[in-house]
């Protein structure tokens, strides 16, 4: 079928032809995420996915949506767009696995000042890679050109995921008790939260060239490279643990750091007792704290501090959980703390 073209619409700033070109360029990446449950291809009004309920007594769907925040500004300055999509997927799927669910499908939304097909394809390349890592299918998306609302070179990125979990296996903290062990799954860096403060610490908006410097603390990486490290996707190792261990709670450490996110999975009357000396904090966070003269409390209340996800498990199953994590892509997972009587997070 011949593609349509509108000179009037193009004159208003919306290039339909660029949209077609973007879709053609991204098809090869989207194809990597498809499986036998996907029905149809790109171009429909909705993404179709056949739900296989085999093995589920009472399947429950869980949805999540998120974006990448102002980490996008770092990607734009560095002109590197092929990993920011991984961040978008990670922010969504890491949230829904906190209920014990397996992500099934993902959709993305890109708003841009001008549709530059090669750039859009690079963004979607990252989204597709994130979907592969999370073992879910990229079944649809939208690229919206916003002339007059956004500068031509800028874009925003958001995503949406749906997962499934058996109702009887939805994670519950009802049996959480003092003595349970908190396990840490290391992050790859700042992940996708706190970048407004990061930009202020390094004065990035006024001095973007700082991203091309290589502070000694970063072991040869530039600041921009360290900050753009993609958010880790924890789906596969966590699902493996859930198969064999009585996990009592999972927290994805995002905006708000330890103090906001760990309590979200705690039972009332329980607190997370963590020795600060046991937190394996990467050099990047130490550089940020020193450069910005940020208090320790604010660091733990804003950033993940090197811990991207925590699992709470019975003490007698902690070693087994660590063995599973170590064998499934999380070789550096470690004991972070214990559950005690109280409320919230106790960093001592």
Which residues make up each language-model segment?
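Hydrophobic face of alpha-helices
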Residues: 23, 121-124, 195
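N-terminal amphipathic/basic leader segments beginning at the initiator methionine
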Residues: 2-37
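Residue-level signature of catalytic and energy-coupling elements of molecular machines
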Residues: 15, 66, 179, 252, ...
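Buried hydrophobic packing segments
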Residues: 22, 26, 48, 92-93, ...
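Short, acidic (Asp/Glu-rich) active-site segment that either coordinates a divalent metal cofactor
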Residues: 156, 169-222
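Glycine-rich phosphate/pyrophosphate-binding loop regions near the starts of catalytic domains
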Residues: 28-188
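Short, glycine-/Ser/Thr-/acidic-enriched flexible segments
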Residues: 54, 67-68, 162-166, 188-190, ...
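Glycine-/charge-enriched secondary-structure boundary and capping motifs
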Residues: 2-12, 119-137, 150-157, 207-211, ...
């Amino acid at each position: 079928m011949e593609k349509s073209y509108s000179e009037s619409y193009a004159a208003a700033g919306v290039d339909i032809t660029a949209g077609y070109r973007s879709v053609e360029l991204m098809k090869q990446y989207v194809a990597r995420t498809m499986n036998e449950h996907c029905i149809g291809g790109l171009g429909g009004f909705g993404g179709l996915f056949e739900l296989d309920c085999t093995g589920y007594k009472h399947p429950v769907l869980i949805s999540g949506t998120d974006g990448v925040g102002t980490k996008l500004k770092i990607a734009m300055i560095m002109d590197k767009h092929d990993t920011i999509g991984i961040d978008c997927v990670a922010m969504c799927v890491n949230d829904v696995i906190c209920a014990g669910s397996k992500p099934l499908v993902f959709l993305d939304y890109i708003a841009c000042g001008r549709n530059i097909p090669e750039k859009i394809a690079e963004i979607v390349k990252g989204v597709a890679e994130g979907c592969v890592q999370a073992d879910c299918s990229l079944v649809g998306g939208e690229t919206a050109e916003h002339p007059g609302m956004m500068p031509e070179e800028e874009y925003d990125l958001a995503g949406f995921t749906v997962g499934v979990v058996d109702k009887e296996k939805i994670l519950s903290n009802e049996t959480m008790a003092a003595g349970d062990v908190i396990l840490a799954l290391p992050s790859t860096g700042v992940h996708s939260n706190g970048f407004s403060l990061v930009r202020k610490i390094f004065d990035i908006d006024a001095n973007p060239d700082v991203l091309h410097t290589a502070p000694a603390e970063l072991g040869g990486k530039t600041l921009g490279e360290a900050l753009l490290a993609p958010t880790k996707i924890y789906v596969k190792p966590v699902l493996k643990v859930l198969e064999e261990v009585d996990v009592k709670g999972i927290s994805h450490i995002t905006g708000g750091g330890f103090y906001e996110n760990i309590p979200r999975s705690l039972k009332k009357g329980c607190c997370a007792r963590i020795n600060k000396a046991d937190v394996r904090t990467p050099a990047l966070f130490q550089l940020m704290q020193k450069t910005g003269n940020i208090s320790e409390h604010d660091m733990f209340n804003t950033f993940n501090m090197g811990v991207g996800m925590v699992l709470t498990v019975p003490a007698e199953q902690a070693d087994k959980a660590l063995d599973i994590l170590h064998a499934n892509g999380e070789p550096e997972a470690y004991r972070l703390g214990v559950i005690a009587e109280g409320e919230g997070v106790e960093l001592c």
